[in-house]
Amino acid sequence: DIGKNIQTIRYANKLTQDQVIAKLNLMGISMSKSTYAKLETNRMNIKVSELVALAKIFHTDINAFFSGLL
């Protein structure tokens, strides 16, 4: 699932949730820790703008978030 892929990519980048949230906030995407946690556990839908920002933060292609879904 997308949330698990986001978490896996975050771990691979050796970033904490707080670090990712800080980077998102600097990019103009306001997000709380609880909201981010919901994204990683698929309890909340992610916006395309958030996926694009995460791809930049993780230095990866947006398609990486969809790995194993098809």
Please describe what each predicted stretch is.
Residues 9, 23, 39, 68:
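Residues in the recognition helix of alpha-helical DNA-binding motifs
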Residues 6, 17, 33, 48-51:
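Helix-turn-helix DNA-binding elements, focusing on the entry/boundary residues of the two helices
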Residues 64-70:
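Short amphipathic recognition helices of helix-turn-helix/homeodomain-type DNA-binding modules
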Residues 47-64:
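DNA major-groove recognition helix of helix-turn-helix/homeodomain DNA-binding modules
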Residues 15-38:
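Short alpha-helical DNA-recognition segment
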Residues 1-13:
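A short, Lys/Arg-rich alpha-helix, primarily the initiator
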Residues 10, 21, 25, 55:
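The alpha-helix within a helix-turn-helix
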